[in-house]
Amino acid sequence: MGLSISEIRKNTTRARHLMQRTRAQRFAVGAFNIDNQETLIAVARAAQKLQSPVLVEVSDAEVKAMGLENVRDLVDNYKAEYGIEMYLNLDHGPTVEGCKRAIDAGYEFIHIDISQANHNASDEEIIAKTREVVEYAKFTGALVESEPHYFGGSSNVHTEDINYEEIKKTFSTPEGARAFVEATGIDTFAAAIGNLHGKYPVPKVLDLDLLADIREAIHCQISLHGGSGTPLHYFEDAVKIGVSKININSDMRYAFRTTLEKTLRENPNEYAIVKLMPPVYVAVQEVVESKIKAFNSVRKAVV
């Protein structure tokens, strides 16, 4: 069941107020990727328990698996059931058309990432297509996020170490961030400061001095992608500097899979899926709760 334009605009207005609160109250909202209804429930339970605002997000693969509008309906249903402040983000949308469909479906947050589909996309193409989404989003008030180039990793569990000499080549710069924000009019800039998609065998190292310089250079919100596997103290410091949104995916997937595998080993004769899920809910919820606490968003929800 689709939302009316008045309902969508009401939601995006509340989403904008949330992002303003992150700056004023020095917290970040967690953006938690969901792969299915079970992970959505885990996020909702964590948000309710800690009275925290949350974003749930889906990328292209999840959209294809679950359906753009189906995800919208699920989020609205659980938001109402749990009485929580929860919004929906399209994560790493690779096409203008896909982003427009999400805007029409009432997604409050849109991440347009042209370089996701084409790592060699030109600056001109990235700016033009990002600007097109920004203009389209004005009809509903959806907040648009983007970045000027692709940065590496994948939302998986990796066995290789992190090559920071290579990663540094993709770091954001204050000058580049300012130029991109001014050229596109985005609401949120996705900074690259050592954050990397995926979970690695070594902890990630974030350049907080660079983050502070970027914060000084731009007026809009700042997000950090690739939050999984990052020592929590980095998040605590990033929030103080002024990061408003932090993405988490691989840590949740790892908790889901490893807990499910353990549960299956311990219950070899159980075939009722709903009876196998309770430990999985708990494991994923614990991951979400730990991030919420590090992001300083406990008791920051406005319902």
List the model feature ranges, each with a label.
Residues 1-30:
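N-terminal amphipathic alpha-helix/helix-capping segment at the start of soluble metabolic enzymes
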Residues 9, 120, 201, 278, ...:
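Charge-dense, low-complexity intrinsically disordered segments
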